[in-house]
């Protein structure tokens, strides 16, 4: 066993002595030692209950004859970090989470690993670590939050963000806003729509690194705790069979995950995270693959924020497995991909059934013929930009808009809420990319304000930053190259015309080449916003959003 490095032989007597100081018996030490990476904390609603999930995992490990050893890692709540300087740390935390799990699992050579995340950057961070380590591993999440209720209407966190814009526009009262504040988020779990956390939890299941049901079983149910026990039991079997993450997360598995991404209408953040995870397995996923798979994958689910349904509805309809079963009917899924169940995708799907075709549309009757996400290219985004096309109003799929330029997310949010943005405008937020932000902040406050103020059918937003999974509307992010490295977005001036052509996957600055050259000759790189601490190091090392915003090492140069 791998753990023999720290427990076997005469020379390891001091090591065993330290284990015994913590109460481990010799019988426990003789079993497989399994790390349980628990990201529980008291600042994320999706993580507030993870101690209970981890306890269920450990119970499962013991039931199957292993010895669990729990350790912790950090987690940022994107909702609470939103619209202030804290959001710069969210994406950047992904790398620290991956590194911390690597450190703990290499310093203490576990035989296997169970990752217990639930929210936005923690899930990809742990998946990156699993593939980097390539020891037997499984991921079990905490599960989605139930929808809230305000009066007779089901609501969620994004309802509150959008209500701020509605209040500013005078269309709701303070009493109505406070009611939403009190009841939109009823308890523990990842926020209730197909936002980034639930997107990544669903994709971990589609990728094969989590058990069926991981993406959709609600946090508050006994079924979630049973799944956690099963994950604990399953890791012992994965160790015995020596099944490792890179044997599961192959090119075919990533294509399956992206295909499911398109069918579900997942968060645009998946376009950052999936390539970053694949990179740890030595797989290069080009952005063009997202367009290729989107063009052939029907959009089958209309989930919040772009539709009426919540994760609990998707779970009741059969979950991710039922979606994959629909896709399999048209051979859009690789059925021979292996999963942590020890069975192939095809075998897993044999018992799956779509029990509610109003939530999971049959593949013969999709919401849209193309997938939820599109990659746009053009002179404004030579390396690409990302939009959740399934959440864009038809009026904004092809439109020429006037540029209203802001140098930060905070300034843009203020301008929108102060009524300075008019129909036909495109809000440009720049110097918010991975290097420029630094940290590539999410733009949920300005996009929610646009929707809340009734401008969703008339105003677009373009940024080198990124968006919350809760964003809807013509919100185009990850514009690459970013402004801080001299990307074309840095050359936009107030009043410029910009063509947003989602139908043809184009994003064009309608300014002639000579004018752009003159502007470029005058452009100077701004001074770094951060000169000390982690974000200063991050800004120095981070790569483009078009390559997953991963950190560059010396050998990458």
From Swiss-Prot:
Its cofactor is [2Fe-2S] cluster; Mg(2+). InterPro entries: Dihydro-acid_dehy_C (IPR042096), DihydroxyA_deHydtase (IPR004404), DiOHA_6PGluconate_deHydtase_CS (IPR020558), ILV_EDD_C (IPR056740), ILV_EDD_N (IPR000581), IlvD/EDD_N (IPR037237). It catalyses: (2R)-2,3-dihydroxy-3-methylbutanoate = 3-methyl-2-oxobutanoate + H2O; (2R,3R)-2,3-dihydroxy-3-methylpentanoate = (S)-3-methyl-2-oxopentanoate + H2O. Mg(2+) binds at residues 78, 120-121, 442. The active site is at 468 (proton acceptor). Its EC number is 4.2.1.9. One of its GO terms (biological process) is isoleucine biosynthetic process. It holds the Pfam family ILVD_EDD_N. One of its GO terms (molecular function) is 2 iron, 2 sulfur cluster binding. GO terms for cellular component: cytosol. PROSITE patterns: ILVD_EDD_1, ILVD_EDD_2. The modification N6-carboxylysine is found at residue 121. Keywords: 2Fe-2S, Amino-acid biosynthesis, Branched-chain amino acid biosynthesis, Iron, Iron-sulfur, Lyase, Magnesium, Metal-binding. It is an enzyme of class 4 (lyase). HAMAP family: IlvD. Belongs to the IlvD/Edd family. Homodimer. This is Dihydroxy-acid dehydratase. The gene is ilvD.
């Amino acid at each position: 066993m791998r753990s023999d490095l720290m427990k076997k032989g005469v020379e390891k007597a001091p090591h065993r002595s330290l284990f015994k100081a913590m109460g481990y018996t010799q019988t426990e030490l003789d079993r497989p030692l399994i790390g349980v990476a628990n990201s529980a904390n008291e600042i994320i609603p999706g993580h507030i209950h993870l101690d209970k999930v981890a306890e269920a995992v450990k119970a499962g490990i013991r039931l199957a004859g292993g010895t669990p050893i729990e350790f912790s890692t950090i987690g940022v709540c994107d909702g609470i970090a939103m619209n202030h300087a804290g959001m710069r740390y969210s994406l950047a935390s992904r790398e620290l989470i991956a590194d911390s799990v690597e450190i703990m699992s290499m310093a203490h050579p576990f035989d296997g690993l169970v990752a217990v995340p639930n929210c936005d950057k923690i899930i990809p961070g742990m998946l990156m670590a699993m593939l980097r380590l390539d020891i037997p591993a499984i991921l079990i999440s905490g599960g989605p939050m139930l929808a809230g209720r305000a009066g007779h209407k089901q609501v969620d966190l994004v309802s509150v963000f959008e209500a701020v814009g509605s209040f500013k526009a005078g269309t709701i009262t303070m009493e109505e806003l406070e009611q939403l504040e009190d009841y939109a988020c009823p308890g523990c779990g990842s926020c209730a729509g197909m936002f980034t956390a639930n997107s990544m939890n669903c994709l971990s299941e589609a990728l094969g690194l989590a058990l069926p049901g991981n993406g959709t079983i609600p946090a508050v149910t006994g079924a979630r705790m049973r799944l956690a026990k099963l994950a604990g039991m399953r890791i012992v079997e994965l160790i015995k069979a020596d099944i490792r993450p890179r044997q599961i997360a192959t090119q075919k598995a990533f294509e399956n995950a992206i295909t499911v991404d398109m069918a579900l209408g997942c968060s645009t953040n998946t376009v950052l995270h999936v390539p970053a995870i694949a990179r740890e397995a030595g797989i290069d996923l080009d952005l063009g693959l997202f367009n290729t798979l989107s063009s052939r994958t029907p959009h089958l689910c209309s989930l919040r924020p772009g539709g009426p349904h919540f994760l609990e509805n998707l779970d009741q309809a059969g979950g991710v497995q039922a979606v994959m079963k629909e896709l399999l009917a048209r051979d859009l899924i690789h059925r021979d991909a292996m999963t942590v169940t020890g069975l192939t995708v095809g075998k897993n799907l044999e018992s799956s059934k779509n029990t509610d075709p109003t939530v999971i549309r049959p593949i013969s009757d999709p919401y849209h013929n193309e997938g939820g996400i599109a990659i746009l290219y053009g002179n404004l985004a030579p390396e690409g930009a990302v939009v959740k096309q399934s959440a864009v109003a038809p009026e904004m799929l092809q439109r020429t808009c006037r540029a209203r330029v802001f140098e930060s997310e905070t300034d843009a949010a203020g301008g929108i809420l102060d009524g300075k943005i008019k129909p036909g405008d495109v809000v440009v937020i720049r110097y918010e990319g991975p290097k420029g932000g630094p940290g590539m902040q999410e733009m949920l406050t300005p996009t929610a304000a646009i929707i809340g103020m009734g401008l969703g059918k008339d105003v677009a937003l373009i940024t080198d930053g990124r968006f919350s999974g809760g964003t809807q509307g013509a919100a185009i992010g990850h514009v690459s190259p970013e402004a801080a490295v001299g990307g074309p977005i840095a050359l936009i001036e107030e009043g410029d015309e910009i063509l947003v052509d989602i139908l043809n996957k184009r994003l064009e600055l309608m300014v002639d080449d000579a004018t752009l050259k003159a502007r470029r000759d005058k452009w100077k790189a701004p001074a770094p916003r951060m000169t000390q601490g982690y974000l200063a190091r991050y800004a120095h090392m981070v790569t483009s959003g078009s390559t997953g915003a991963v950190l560059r090492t010396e050998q990458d140069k």
